[in-house]
Structures are given as C-alpha cells and as structure tokens.
Amino acid sequence: TMCYSHTTTSRAILTNCGENSCYRKSRRHPPKMVLGRGCGCPPGDDNLEVKCCTSPDKCNY
C-alpha cells in the first residue's frame, strides 16, 4: 500500500508500506493540526487522534 509519510518538520513523501494500513495523526484539541502521517496504525491518546485506513493507495491524505 502506498501511504503518505511525514513528520511536522518534513515534507510528505509517498512510501510503499509493507503493511496495508496508513495513519494520519492530528491534535485532538484546537488548533487541530496534522502532526504526521505514515505506515501502520499506532495508538492514539488523550491529545492525539490517530485515523487509520486501509486501501486504496494514499488513503491518509
């Protein structure tokens, strides 16, 4: 699966992920900025909302 991958300081690049899920991590509270994207599905917490998705490619735009 092709996923977007970046952190707050890097530009988004497309990465070919071994697993078939991508995630998009953002702040739960305003300002709701996106903090990163990547492969897999890490857990969120009280401050971080993690949206995971599988297929199609680039689903974590």
Swiss-Prot record:
Positions marked as site (Blocks the entrance of the active site gorge of hAChE): M33
Molecular function as annotated in GO: toxin activity
Outcome of swapping R27W: 49-fold decrease in inhibition potency
Main location: secreted
Gene Ontology annotations for the cellular component aspect, listed alphabetically: extracellular region
Bridged cysteine pairs (disulfide): C3-C22, C17-C39, C41-C52, C53-C59
Result, substituting R28D: No significant difference in inhibition potency
UniProt tissue specificity: Expressed by the venom gland.
Any single Pfam family the record assigns to this protein: Toxin_cobra-type
Keyword Disulfide bond attributed: yes
PROSITE patterns documented for this protein: SNAKE_TOXIN
Effect of R11Q: 6-fold increase in inhibition potency
Record-linked SUPFAM superfamilies: Snake toxin-like
Location of the protein in the cell: Secreted
Keywords: Disulfide bond, Secreted, Toxin
Family stated for the protein in its record: Belongs to the three-finger toxin family. Short-chain subfamily. Acn-esterase inhibitor sub-subfamily.
Known role: Interferes with neuromuscular transmission by inhibiting the enzyme acetylcholinesterase (AChE) present at the neuromuscular junction. It selectively binds and inhibits with a 1:1 stoichiometry the mammalian and electric fish AChE at picomolar concentrations. It is highly specific for the peripheral site of AChE and blocks the entry of acetylcholine into the active site of the enzyme (through the Met-33 residue), thereby preventing its breakdown. It has been called fasciculin since after injection into mice it causes severe, generalized and long-lasting (5-7 hours) fasciculations.
The protein's name in its UniProt record: Fasciculin-2
Naturally occurring in which organism (per UniProt): Dendroaspis angusticeps (Eastern green mamba)
